[in-house]
């Protein structure tokens, strides 16, 4: 699977699992993405896909690396569809 395809799948999953934040942008908690069964089956490396999407300015989140448990409440914000 190529990175662009995985990033597109990530955008679809953020639409499915996310909700609008105060700024009107779609947002989902990292823990929600990480624990979702469909996401677990889709993404071999969710954190790597998130980093690729962040580099492309498709999503944003604080910091560079997200870890299960520690960062479950971190918002992943969709910047573009």
From Swiss-Prot:
Name of a matching Pfam family: Costars
Coiled coil spans: none
Alphabetized InterPro entries for the sequence: Costars, Costars_dom, Costars_sf
GO biological process: regulation of actin filament-based process
Keywords: Acetylation
Domain of life: Eukaryota
Intrachain S-S bonds: none
Annotated positions of the N-acetylmethionine modification: 1
Similarity comment: Belongs to the costars family.
The protein's name: Costars family protein ABRACL
Taxon lineage: Eukaryota, Metazoa, Chordata, Craniata, Vertebrata
Underlying gene: ABRACL
